[in-house]
Each structure stands twice: as C-alpha cells, then as structure tokens.
Amino acid sequence: MKTRLALLSLLLSGAVPVWAQAPFFQDKTISVILGGPPAGSADLRTRAVINVLRKHIPGNPTILIQHMGGGGGRQAANHVYKVAKPDGLTIGSMGAALVTNAILGEPGVQYDIDKLIYLGTPDSAQHYLFITHGDAGLTSLEKLRAASNVRIAAQSVGHPIYITGRVFAYLLGLKEAKFVVGFTGPEIDVALAQREADARVSTGDSLIRRNRDWLDKGLVDVHASIEIPKGERHPRFAQVPELASFAKSDRERKMIEMFRAFRIAGQNFFLPPGVPRERTQILADAMRKTLGDPEFLKEYQKLSGEAASPLAAEALEKVIKELPRDANVVELFNKLGGADPLPGR
C-alpha cells in the first residue's frame, strides 16, 4: 500500500522516476570531428566504427561525420579540445598525428593529450618492413649496410612512410642514404620495379596484398622489421630481424618505444575534457562493444582492406601516458622526421 501511495505521489508531482527516463542520447545527434579528408584511409576507418557504434549506444543516436583536415588534423583536435561542448555529443577522430604532433611540439597544437578522454582505436597493430629490390644486389643485411647512397622512396618529407624509412636507415646504419620523395603509395612500387629507387618501407599486410609475387618469386629482399606492438611478429616475416636489436643506446631504444607508441595510438576516438563521467562511460562501453562486434570487424576489413587491431579506452590511455617524452629522444625523433641528412650515432 505504501509503495502504491509513493508511486501515485510521484506521478502527481510531475517527477519522472529514473527507470522511466529516456536515455540521454535518444533523439540526439553526435558529431564526429574527423581530422582528415573524405574518402581517405582515416575516413574509411572512422566510418567502419560509426556504422556499428550507433547500435551500441543506448538511445541509438544519429552519428554524422564532419571533416576538418586543416593543419594535418590539428584543426580538428583543437576544435574538439577548445570549442566543442563537453556534453558527449562531439567525438574526435584522428590518426596517430594527434599524439605525435603534441609530443614533438609541432606548431599549432592547442590541446593537451593528457586531458583528452580516450574511447579507443580500431587500428593499433602494424608490422613495418624495410625491403630492397633484388636488382639492387643488396641481398643481405651485410651488403645493405656496406652500400652507399641507397635510394629510399617515399611520399613526402614528414609522411609516416618517410619517417619510418628514416628510422630504419638510421638504426641500420646506412651510409649516406638518399630519400627520393614525390610518389603516391602505388607509385613507390612502380619506382622500385623500374629501378628509380632501391628500397622502400611497406607494411607486411600491404606487401602481401599488393605484391605477393615479389615475395613468392624472390624479387625483393626483406632486411628488418618493426613489430607494433612489441613481440607481436607477423607470421610471414617471423625470421626477419627486429629493428630494436640494432639500437646502441638507451636514447635509441626509447626512440623506438616512442615510434611504437605513436603507431599504437592508431585512429584515436576521443572526447574533450569535462564530459560527465556517466556519458563518458556510456560511450566507452559502446566503443568497447563495437570493437568486438563481428559486424564491425567485417565492415572494417571491407572498408579499409585490413584486419582491425582494436584497443579499448583504458589500454589506449595507458599507452599514451607511458609514452617516452625525454627531451633528447624528442630531439632525435624530430631530426629523423626532417629533410636534413641523418644524424650521426
């Protein structure tokens, strides 16, 4: 009787009991601010996530993408951090540059990566390979390290593949390596085949997908790899030396750790500081369910051409917090990302 009277009193007062309240996100629209252009790889990865994320958020809100590609994604990150209301209705999506730009002190960064709220990433693992064309005659690591003026093809100064090539060349101790830039990704393969370049960096999966015959016919030599995360070897290249084994100092080892952490950060999904804890938890839980959803895994493979390698919110936050930030390591990484000759060791 008392329970009935209490319920009647509640209804007459106009208050809505907690169990009867609609989910916060019901009939709402979430804007995903993407630091990249339409139809690019970041766009495809982001779409693979949001196509499934909606069903895991109570209330099934509408989710729309807004592209902000200016400043290599910095405009998007700055907007989420400084402009967006911290109400859970704005989510940022940006590649590893979100973390890289902040740690390396790039101009135009107006956000603090330690204050952003991370939801997770669908893209945390990668296996980079340093390969040379068979016609270059660099059939062993010893011959590669003894050679001078090895021509390494890449897209542009500062591009992730360019920086990765410089990291390989530096730690392998290549003599006066020459970086030939100005290619698209597919054009690098053509440049290698037509002997306009001797070497390139590729991911293991991309090499198998695009140029399996190069491997099957022994047309290229694979000299070293970078495992991301550490210890996770690509089954096809398990016997290839890992680049960290060539580090000579603690500074160089930390530089490799920094490189790994930058890549593990992958396609970050994040919130501005100050989003209420309850809404943050709802979105983090929804992202966790999405990243483990078979529908998402299939969608990601279809759109990106690669298998997803998800990392949930807590693990992603841990990677970023533990990232080496020593000034001398940052200085070395910045030199490797630039256009000047490789620094001495």
Model segments located where?
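C-terminal lobe and pocket-closing loops
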Residues: 210-291, 339-345
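Extracytoplasmic ligand-binding site segments that recognize negatively charged/polar headgroups
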Residues: 122-134, 151-169
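Bacterial N-terminal signal peptides
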Residues: 6-17
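Short coil/turn segments
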Residues: 37-39, 96, 133-138, 155-160, ...
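Hydrophobic/proline-rich hinge and linker segments of small-molecule sensing/allosteric domains
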Residues: 103, 120-146, 223-238, 245, ...
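N-terminal (or domain-start) structured segment
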Residues: 20-118, 161, 171-214, 291-310, ...
